[in-house]
C-alpha cells in the first residue's frame, strides 16, 4: 500500500498496488508536509518492515539450502520463532502527539539519505549474495582445476580491497568531523528551542492530525501484513511443488542410471557375442575355402567329362543357354556384392561417428561427476554463510532496537521545545509545496516505469513458462524414442539368435552335402573308369568287326550294337550335362551362402552401430535432462529475483514516502550506525571480493561450456554432412534396386504383414508397460541364458574346429593327390581329346565303309544268285565241280561256326556290359534323386535368402528411421541453442534495465542532493530572516519605548492643557487665538510621529519582499 498525500484539498488519497485511489475525507484543513512530520514510531515501523523483509529473504535462502540437501542441519538454519511469527512479537505502543522540530533540516536530510542509501546497499548486497551463491555453485561445478589462477586474482582483489578500505576510513573521518559540526548546530538549536515554548497550543492541533494519520497508517500496515501472510502461504505451496518436482527428477535420474548400467552390461555381452561371431566367421571361412576347393575339383571332373563327350553337337545349345543364365546370375550376384560393400562402408563410417560420440559422452560424464562434487562443497559453504549472516542480523536487530529506544527518549524530550518556528516557516510553505508537486510528478513517473517493468517481467515469465513446457514436451518425446530404441534392440538380439541358429543348421546341412557330394564324386569316378573300359572294349570290337565283314546278317547285328552304344553315349552326355548344371547350381548356392554369411557380418556390424547409437542417444538424453534441470533452476532463480526486485521497488517507493516524514528525526542514530556500518562494510567488501572471484569463475565456466557446445555443433555438422552423403548413396542404391522390383513386390506384402504385427505388438507393449526393474530382471535372465548358449556354442565350435583341423589335414593330403591327379588328368584329357578325334574320324570312315560294303554286298549277292542259277544249270552237267564246291562249303562252314562261336562270346560280353550299363543307370537314378533333394535344399536356402533379404530391408528401414530420429535430435539441439541464445539476450536486456535503474537511482540521488541544497538555501534564508526579525524586534522595542515616552508626554501635555483650559475658561474671548495656535502645534507633532511609524512599516515590508525574492 502506497500513500499519496494530495495537497491543496480537504482529502488525501491512498494508492493501492493495483492503482486504485481510495480517498478519505478529513474535517480539518490539509496540512503541508512541513507540518505533518513523521515521528520516531513511524521510522521504527518502516525500519521494522525492512528488517522483516530481510528476515524473509534469509528464511527463503535457508529453505533453498534445505531443499539442496542440508536437511540434517535444519536446526542450525532455523530462525527464532519471534522473528517468524508476527503474532508473537510485542505490539508497539503508539507514541503520544508531539511537536515537530524543524531545526537543522539540512543535517536531517543528509542523515535520511545516508540511511536510505545504507538500506539500499544492504538489499543490493543480499541480492548480490544470492547471485554469487548461484554463480559459486555453477562455477565450482564447471571449473574445479583453476584454483591457482583464482588465487592470483584473489590477491589482486585483496590489494584493491585494502586500498578501498583506506579510502573508506578517510571518508569515515570526514563524516565524523561533519557529525561534530552537526552536534554543535544541534546544541545551538536546542538553545533556540528553549525560547520558543510559547507556541505549544498551535502544535496540539498538528498532533491531532498526526494521530489521525497514524491510525490510517496502522490500517495500511494491517493490510500489508495480511498480504505478506498470503505471500508466505504461496511460497509454502511453491516449496511443496518444488520438493515434488525434485523427488520426481531424482527418481528419473535413478532410473536413467539403472538403464545406463543395464546398457553397459548389455554392451559387454554384445562384445562377447561379437568375438564369438568372429570365431564362427573364421570357421565358416575355412569351410567355405574347403567347399571352394571341392567345387574346383568338381569343375575339373566336369571338364574332363565335357572333353570326353565333346563329340555330341546336340547338347552344345543347352550348354550355351546354361552359360548365359550363369552370366545373368553372376551379374546379379556382383550387384548384390557391390551393395553389400557399400553398406559395409556406411557401417564403418557410422561406427567412427559412434566412437566419437562415445568419447564426448565420457567427457560429459566426467564433467557431471566433477560438477556434483563441487555442488556439495558449495552447499556446505552456503550453509555456513547463511548461519553467519543470521547471527549478524540478530546482533544488528538488538543494536537497532536499543538505538530506537534511546531515540524515542531523546525525541520525547525534544518535542517539548520544537513548536516555536512554525510562524517563521509559513513564508516557506509555497516553495516547499512547489517542490512537493515536482516530487509527486517524479513519483508518478517512477510508478509508470515500475508498471512497465512489471509488464515486461510478466511477458518474460510467460515466455519462460512456454519454453519450459516446450522442453518438457521434448523430454517426453525423447523418452518415447528411448523406449522404441529399446524395443528395436531386443528385436535385433532375437534376430541375431535366429540367424546363429540358422547358420548352425546350414553348416550341418552343408557338411552333409559335402559328404554326399564326395560319395557322388567317387561313384562318378567309378563310372568314368567303366566307361573308359567300355571304350577300349568297343575299340577291340571294332577291330574284330572289321575282319568279319563278309556276311550281311552279322553286319546288321554289329550296326544294332553300334546304335545301342551311340545311344548309351548320348544318354551319358545328357547325364553329364545335367550333372554340370547341378554342379554350377551348387556353386551358385555356395556363392549365395557366402554372401549370406557376409550379410550376417553386416547385420552384426549394424547391430553394433545401433547399440552405439542407442548409448549415444541415452547420453544425449541425460545431458539434455541435466541442461533442462539447470535451465529450470536458473528460471526459478530469475523469477524469484524478479519478484524480489518488484517488492524492493514497492518498498523503495514506500521508504521514499516515509522518508519525507522521517528526514528530520534521524540525527542521533548516526554514530552507532556508522560504527556498525564500518564493520559491515568490511564484511560485505570481503563478500564482494569473493563474489568477484565467483563471477570470474562463472565466466570461465561459461566460456568452456560455449567451447564444448561449439565442438558439439561441429561434430553434429560433420555427422549431418556424412548423413547427406549416405542419403545420396542410398538414393543410388534405390535406383539400382528398382531392377529387382519383382522380388520387392513379393517382399512388400510380407513387410506389410510384419508391420501390422509390429503395430499390434507395439500397441500391446504400450498398453502393458511394466516397471523398468522387471524388464531389467528379464533381460538379465535372458543374458544369462545367452551366455550359457554361447558357452555351448563355443564348445561346439571347439569340437568343430578340431574336426575342421583333421579335415584340413586330410584335405591337404587330398590336394596333393589331386594335384598329381590333375597333372595326370591333363595328360589323359589331351590323349582322350586326340583319341576322341581319331575315334570320330574312324567312326565316320567306318560308316562310309559300311555303306559302300552294303552296296557292294548287295551287288555281290545278286551276282552270286545269278551265278548260282548258272551253276545249278551247269550242276547237272558238272557234278564233279559240285562235290568240289561242297568240300569248299564244308570248309567255309567250319570257319563260319568258329566265327559264330566268337560272335556268341562277344554277345555274352555285350550282355555283361549292358548289365553294367543298367546298374550305372540305376546309380544315375539314385544320383538324380539325390540331386532332387539337393534342389529342395537349395530352394529352402533360397527361401532363407529371401527371408534374410526381408530382414535386411527391415533393417534398412530401421536405419532410415534412426537417421530421421538423428535429424530430429539435431533440430532439437538447434532449438535448445536458440533458446539459450534467447535467454542470454534476455539476461543482457535485464542487465541493461538494471543499468537504467541504476542511472535512475543516480538521478534521484542527484535530485535529492539538489533538494538538500535548496533546503540549505532555505535554512540560510531562515537564519537571515531570524536575524532580521531580531533586529526588527530590537527596533520595535525601541519604537515602543519611544511611543511610551511620547504617550507620557502627550498625557502630561494634555493634562497641562486641560488645566490651562480650565484656567482660561474665564478668559475665552481674549485668549481663543492663543489656544488655537497651541492646538495646531500639537496636531503637527502627532502627524510627524505617525509619518515616522508609517516609514518604519514600509521599510519592514520592503526587507521582507527582498528576502522572499532571494
Curated annotation (Swiss-Prot):
Residues 122-250, 288-313, 413-695, 728-1048 form a coiled coil. PANTHER family: COILED-COIL DOMAIN-CONTAINING PROTEIN 150. Keywords: Coiled coil. This is Coiled-coil domain-containing protein 150. The lineage of its organism: Eukaryota, Metazoa, Chordata, Craniata, Vertebrata.
